[in-house]
A protein has these predicted regions:
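Jelly-roll (double-stranded beta-helix
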Residues: 1-283
Length: 283
């Protein structure tokens, strides 16, 4: 165990060096428009959560998170920057009660029944969205998962706010990351799975490291607060789903495998709005 840990650290250092060497190339493909920090008072009707839902503390925290995410977007999502560290620190403060979020109540309102597979495998609540970011909440019922997927040329921070989640993550084995083509395997590095609760630090992924992950509810349902920079779109940042193929442990102790992408998926979430009647849409 100790030998594997030491070797993995060395490999990750090499990987980080390759990451730095290729950052300029990848950033040319990574679009995050510059903008001045947004104001909470300029939220439009398309936001799911209205200001009446927030107490004074939460208004301040949410506004700071959105403003900080704007600064991170301007820095092309440099995870080594002071701006990104400050965003992660702010995210670590968020709790379910701060968001007025209760997954159990959400499932009750939607008529979810435990172990009933006819319902969507996940709830989605949009908190804030523009062309540079998506701030949202995901809630995964007991025994369900968000399947293995990617975040093309995106970075993100996820903070567990209810329950416990098993997060299985993979990093690109080559840089710059290849384009995803249906049926063409992607070589990745396997990371040890993590179990996260609201007491843990937020999980982080970048365009290069831990960019693929699967999130599974452990025990009861789990909810997490998510910031994606920039958000998915229908042109160059579509979400792809994957299956794991050909896991291989090398002599160095580093596990690699192939992920087989599928551009089509019937996975979907139920939209859950904290104020209005929930609607259903597919993503």
């Amino acid at each position: 165990m100790m030998t594997t840990t030491t070797t993995t650290t060395t490999t990750n250092n090499s990987f980080s060096s390759a990451h730095a060497a290729n950052a300029t190339t990848v950033n040319k493909r990574f679009s995050a428009e510059s903008s001045s920090p947004v104001s909470l008072y300029k939220w439009t009707d398309r936001q799911c959560l209205t200001m009446e839902l927030w107490n004074n503390r939460m208004m301040s925290l949410i506004q700071r998170i959105i403003n900080q995410a704007e600064l991170v977007a301007k820095s092309k999502c440099d995870v080594g920057s002071v701006e990104f560290k400050q965003l992660k620190d702010l995210m670590n403060q968020v709790r379910a009660k701060d968001l007025n979020y209760n997954g159990s109540k959400a499932f009750e309102q939607l008529g979810y029944i435990e172990s009933d597979m006819k319902h969507a495998p996940c709830l989605y609540t949009e908190v804030y969205r523009n062309e540079r970011m998506n701030v949202c909440i995901f809630c995964v019922p007991n025994g369900r998962e968000i399947p293995l997927h990617d975040h093309p040329y995106m970075c993100g921070i996820m903070k567990i706010i209810e329950g416990k989640a098993l997060v299985e993550a993979y990093s690109h084995a080559t840089l710059p990351p290849p384009n995803i083509v249906d049926g063409v395997p992607v070589e990745v590095i396997v990371h040890p799975p993590l179990q996260l609760t609201c007491e843990d630090q937020p999980g982080v992924f970048t365009p290069y490291e831990r960019n693929f992950h699967r999130v599974t509810s452990v025990g009861d349902y789990t909810s997490f607060f998510d910031v994606l920079i920039p958000p998915y779109n229908k042109t160059n940042r579509q979400c792809h789903y994957f299956s794991v193929k050909n896991v291989d442990s090398s002599d160095t102790g580093v596990q690699k495998c192939s992920l087989l992408p599928s551009l089509s998926s019937d996975y979907y979430c139920d939209d859950y709005d904290l104020k209005d009647k929930p609607t259903t849409s597919r993503i």
